[in-house]
């Protein structure tokens, strides 16, 4: 979504349904597919070991996808020069962010045999994912030549939600008294879901139609059919001088209140498991091996009581902060007089952009430098360099064209890695088609 306080210089616009904005991105900090599967003579087990131990608990994996379903807007206000713009639309978003559960990974990879006495931190499990639709209406107001500000209200409808961010506890193996080892659990784990239980319970009549039924059910939740929430975006644009521009915005300052189809799974308590005694063939009990191991399984399951509750919960959106400062220069020179056109815009722009998004453990930051150039009257381009938690060598490129009243834009990141995407820690692509009706020149 754009800054709601961005300047708008057209009379009205309408997005081509399902094509006005398409965005997809995925990233993993600290590791790439190439690190695990490169044909470089290193054994896969060694590559896996390096990944398990080298990644930090603050490393993360993220996926984001957006699809604008409908969008539009129009200018209004002063009949001579409208100074307000009303925008509206509906879009779908998938967002998932999971921290690397380091102690869980080490325990799964190495087991506890070589980690006697080590305390495994169970709070390493931290992540959330959501599939939502967003209905929004915004108003942008141009106060004067220097200041423009705007607000956008949002109604969220949650299709699916998963959340596990407040886990606590530990696991440690020590030498035992009645057996070789004691396994000590101190558990306070919670996994919250909404929209999932009804999908799992969908009837399957044996014709492999579960997927079709699930899609149909999710479609019902797109507009006011799921758990609802409210959000707010606000932003501004300021020109301290003619060629300088400063912008700022806060987006998705909001929440979703989950009351429908809610299930929360909890595992709490302190437990000690002393392992099993060996089974000897002539123990005189008459118990078979299968019966013995079933008893062990039952005892272990009784030790851990997984509770399922249907308590309402609030899921806060991940707020986003954007800021930029830029400088424009180089007006078009007219051949007829070898002078600049007074009513033309600048051809070049350079600047810095800052982005931050709130996450459950700590914010995620990125900073970008960019150069913008109007190549032709109908085509402009933009080159960016971004440093963030994924990479320090992220170079992106974007193009925007205006042919007639149709605008098309496309932008991609991490161009240097496109020859082998497996090496990339992050990749993103966005594009869109919109119909724009310009202001009449006075």
Predicted feature residues:
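Subset of outer-membrane beta-barrel
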Residues: 1-442
């Amino acid at each position: 979504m754009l800054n709601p306080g961005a300047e708008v210089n057209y009379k009205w616009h309408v997005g081509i349904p399902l094509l006005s904005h398409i965005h997809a991105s995925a990233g993993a900090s600290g590791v790439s597919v190439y690190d695990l599967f490169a044909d470089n003579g290193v054994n896969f087990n060694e590559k896996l070991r390096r990944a398990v131990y080298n990644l930090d608990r603050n490393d993360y994996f993220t996926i984001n996808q957006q699809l604008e379903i409908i969008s539009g807007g129009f200018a209004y206000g002063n009949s001579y020069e409208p100074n307000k713009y009303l925008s509206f639309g509906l879009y779908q978003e998938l967002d998932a962010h999971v921290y690397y559960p380091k102690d869980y990974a080490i325990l799964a990879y190495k087991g506890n045999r070589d980690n006697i006495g080590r305390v495994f931190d169970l709070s390493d499990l931290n992540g959330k994912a959501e599939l939502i639709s967003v209905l929004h209406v915004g108003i942008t107001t141009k106060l004067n030549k220097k200041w423009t500000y705007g607000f956008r209200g949002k109604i969220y409808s949650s299709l699916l939600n998963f959340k596990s961010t407040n886990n606590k506890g530990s696991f440690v193996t020590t030498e035992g008294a009645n057996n070789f080892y004691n396994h000590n659990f101190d558990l306070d784990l919670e996994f919250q879901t909404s929209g999932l239980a009804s999908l799992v319970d969908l009837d399957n009549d044996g014709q492999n139609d579960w997927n079709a039924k699930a899609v149909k059910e999710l479609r019902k939740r797109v507009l006011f059919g799921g758990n609802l929430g409210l959000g707010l975006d606000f932003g501004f644009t300021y020109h301290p001088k003619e060629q300088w521009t400063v912008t700022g915005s806060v987006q998705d300052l909001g929440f979703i209140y989950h009351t429908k189809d809610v299930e929360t799974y909890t595992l709490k308590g302190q437990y000690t498991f002393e392992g099993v005694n060996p089974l000897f063939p002539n123990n005189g009990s008459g118990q078979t091996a299968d019966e013995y191991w079933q008893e062990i399984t039952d005892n272990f399951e009784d030790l851990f009581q997984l509770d399922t509750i249907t308590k309402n919960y609030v899921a806060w959106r991940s707020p986003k902060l954007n800021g930029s400062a830029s400088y424009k220069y180089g007006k078009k020179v007219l051949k007829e007089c070898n002078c600049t056109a007074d009513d033309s815009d600048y051809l070049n722009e350079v600047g810095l952009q800052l982005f931050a998004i709130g996450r459950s453990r700590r914010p995620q930051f990125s900073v970008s430098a960019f150069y913008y150039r109007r190549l032709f009257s109908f085509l402009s381009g933009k080159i960016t360099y971004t440093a963030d938690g994924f990479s320090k060598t992220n170079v992106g490129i974007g193009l925007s064209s205006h042919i007639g009243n149709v605008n098309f834009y496309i932008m991609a990141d991490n161009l240097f890695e496109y020859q082998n995407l497996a090496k990339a820690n992050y990749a993103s692509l966005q594009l869109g088609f919109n119909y724009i009706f310009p202001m009449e020149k006075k």
